[in-house]
Amino acid sequence: MTDGLWVIPASVLRNLSDKLYEKRKNAALELEGIVKQLAVAGDHEKISAVINLLSSEFTASPQANHRKGGLIGLAAATVGLTSEAAQHLEQIVPPVLKAFSDQDGRVRYYACEALYNIAKVVRGDFIIFFNKIFDALCKLSADSDANVQSAAHLLDRLVKDIVTESDQFSIEEFIPLLRERMNVLNPYVRQFLVGWITVLDSVPDIDMLGFLPDFLDGLFNMLSDSSHEIRQQADSALSEFLQEIKNSPSVDYGRMAEILVQRAVSPDEFTRLTAITWINEFVKLGGDQLVPYYADILGAILPCISDKEEKIRVVARETNEELRGIKTDPAEGFDVRAILLISKRELSSEWELTRIEALHWISSLLVKHRDEVRDQL
């Protein structure tokens, strides 16, 4: 096997880890030229040896300047490889990703810069590493070093551009990672996540709406964030999805209804209003699809009828009337017993309006389903 030390002149390797940036930069340019010649000659064994040397002797070095030099070198090698770079990505990208968690802020900065330069060369070919890159960027978005945050932001923009133009991106593989990250409370990470949701939703070939139940609760969670900007971004994303739901013939109302019912009793007013507004639209749009969830929906609506916020009371009353107006049949899954239990429970409510509406429901059930109700009373 070829040794990279025989391929790269000692002076280049020495300057690659020099403390002076100019020397490192010039060494990288020389390295790029050497790799370019090897690529033209088709000598991929020597190219692999060079990449291996940069990874093992530089990016894995205990010395920070060596690690920086290794990152610069890997980016330079990729630039030198140009169209041949894709076949070496399995060697090139992992050490750069590892450097994202380096204790030295400058090394993390150089890792962002290196991956940026690598991504510019290989474009869509690096999509195979997307989840790992996304995970790294997610953490770097909240980095303690402002320079690292800035570099990560530039890289993030490039990655978004590449993903939106790529036909290799797998939304199915990405969603579990997104779902896992949605519970993070850090404001920078939350902005990062909403930014990605918005960008992916704007791509015609990516069906984010189909996966909305996987991250809907996370978006609702952001509505009560202490940052006005994050609340606004989450609200904007939710508004866009609700509009898409109105225009979509097939939506999984059930899974989302479960989430909305939980959020309708949130201590945060804005979250309650948004949840009850969604429930209102779902009742209008979903109709009989929501029959199995009627009791849960009613359980969320009745307390909101007496909410201290007038906007919430208005929407809750309207939703209550919509719900009562839908034709129901126990044979189609309408659970008379569950509706009755909710209504009886709300008879003990401290709020008069809620108690009155609960009585209306019991009266309505007696008219439409007398036998079933009498068995339960």
Would you name each region that the model predicts?
Residues 2-11, 17, 25-28, 152-153, ...:
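Long, low-complexity, highly charged intrinsically disordered regions
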Residues 65-139, 144-149:
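A generic tandem-repeat structural signature
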